[in-house]
């Protein structure tokens, strides 16, 4: 069976293949002759980034895992200034990180096509909010393309580069969790010769200070030019191949469906058995093409806009209709929820209310049954993997700092430390926020060591911030510099599992690896020492006792302490071992030694360990044990031992 990375590079125009939405976008970028791709991984965009990393060398594309989205944006933007086709990708909250450069550079335009792929996450399946990128785009006056299928995602990617070059303007390709992760038929197009031969493309930057030096005197002229340009793009989108009107021409009711909502609307109409309706399928939620609106509204008596999250299309349509003097009812967020993702059910309920119909399914009855079943089925909360080094780090931190300590944390697998029995996460906000929050708490409760009023000699509030290795490089560095500079009193534990694990095992500056070979590794402890941290140490969390003792020592220091807890991600390590046919030790419980104290369950919480109610002893599920030996270290009665060959 062919790998996805092979399929994405197939030179088979016309071949129909099954691809994920993100994989289809990667193929589209290659068909568009992309030269530079830079991104920071973030679900639900990561598959695009990883696919580009896998094919970059073979396709002659420069690809990098940037340290954060702002840097990725700037890297790709500079390539586009140099006349190359460039792309950056990020999840929706990543655009917050890139926003400073994004909003400040829109007016400068581009030379080569520049596409910003942003993957939104309605319902927050893997995110801390469900912000709508289309609102950002409207604010910045950047056009948005939004696909309704994987094939359309591929074709839209190519069109986005063409649109960007035609107007020398940024273009956002907006997906959602469902469109990024949906699979569907994709018809392959022609690959450019440079991609097929793997010929690397190089650009040329032409100096123009009045354009690229964003001082007020230069920037002042940009705003009117941006507004003029977006209206020209609006006019262009009247002929966009991803916008069309379908259904009965003489219908009295109409539905506007942008992006993936179009697929839900089509399915909902089939459920309801409704055919006497006109549909405006929008692939460009911003700016909405007004010429197409005029054709669509002709003869209609009422309209429903079905869109996820914010009323971006609705506001544009209502403004246009008001200016045109149209006084027909236009419904949107009064019938379609403003929160969480679109579903077929939501589309059915909204359209049924709009048309005064009964839903074909009794959803209330289904909800009632679901509630009853939910009470019977035992909950299965997420947990850290067996052998996860973060569990050992948290166990040692909790033991050393105690339950009264405050534990700001960050975005990563380790956020699961909030759950029992570890309970060593008290706050999470955004990437890198653990150190800033930890510093703020320390200043608020302990004061700064630079202050005369510092609570010297008094019992200090212990604050232990935890942050991952990739997150440390992403946005942890400025916060660490700030804490050291302002003489904070906080312990920062960097949970270094030598990979960007949660988003798919991508490399980062701490690993030194890049898609093009070995870069330069930047050890976290060297950075902390260079910044002037008052205490720096490196521990192996698989040695719980040594980790505990080091953390106790760090807590005694007045100032900023940094402990790097370094051990490779267990899931990544086991995957590598499986591919190489290697084995790992499996632990079991010696029943005669087990007293049933439950420390291994109630304090440590490895998912491979469970309670046997018959023997009243702990047991290890051998299919889940990955042999880290943490259980043997936390058990006070030495009841855990590695199984011998043949047991």
From Swiss-Prot:
[4Fe-4S] cluster 2 binds at residues 606, 625, 628, 631. Residues 585-614, 616-645 form the 4Fe-4S ferredoxin-type domain. Its EC number is 1.2.7.8. [4Fe-4S] cluster 1 binds at residues 594, 597, 600, 635. Optimum temperature is 70 degrees Celsius. Binds 2 [4Fe-4S] clusters. In this family the first cluster has a non-standard and varying [4Fe-4S] binding motif CX(2)CX(2)CX(4-5)CP. Its cofactor is [4Fe-4S] cluster. It catalyses: indole-3-pyruvate + 2 oxidized [2Fe-2S]-[ferredoxin] + CoA = (indol-3-yl)acetyl-CoA + 2 reduced [2Fe-2S]-[ferredoxin] + CO2 + H(+). GO terms for molecular function: 4 iron, 4 sulfur cluster binding; indolepyruvate ferredoxin oxidoreductase activity; metal ion binding; thiamine pyrophosphate binding. The keyword Oxidoreductase applies. Signal peptide: none annotated. Catalyzes the ferredoxin-dependent oxidative decarboxylation of arylpyruvates. Heterodimer of the IorA and IorB subunits. This is Indolepyruvate oxidoreductase subunit IorA.
